[in-house]
Amino acid sequence: LTCFNDFSPTAHTVEDCQRGITTCYMKTWRVHRETVIERGCGCPKVKPGIRLKCCTGNTCNY
């Protein structure tokens, strides 16, 4: 599985996930009126106030 793995609004870099990982994620949250975006492999638990989207399929976390 290949997922985007960067911290910007436009996804540019990718990573090959470790064997056995079947999902990609995109987390978003607000900091001082700006939206922060984090992408990567897996589907992590998040704190309240953080939006999480998990998906299956190569580069689905755009």
UniProtKB/Swiss-Prot annotation:
It holds the Pfam family Toxin_cobra-type. Keywords: Acetylcholine receptor inhibiting toxin, Disulfide bond, Ion channel impairing toxin, Neurotoxin, Postsynaptic neurotoxin, Secreted, Toxin. One of its GO terms (molecular function) is ion channel regulator activity. Its main location: secreted. It comes from the Eukaryota. CDD domains: TFP_snake_toxin (cd00206). Binds to muscle nicotinic acetylcholine receptor (nAChR) and inhibit acetylcholine from binding to the receptor, thereby impairing neuromuscular transmission. Belongs to the three-finger toxin family. Short-chain subfamily. Type I alpha-neurotoxin sub-subfamily. This is Frontoxin III.
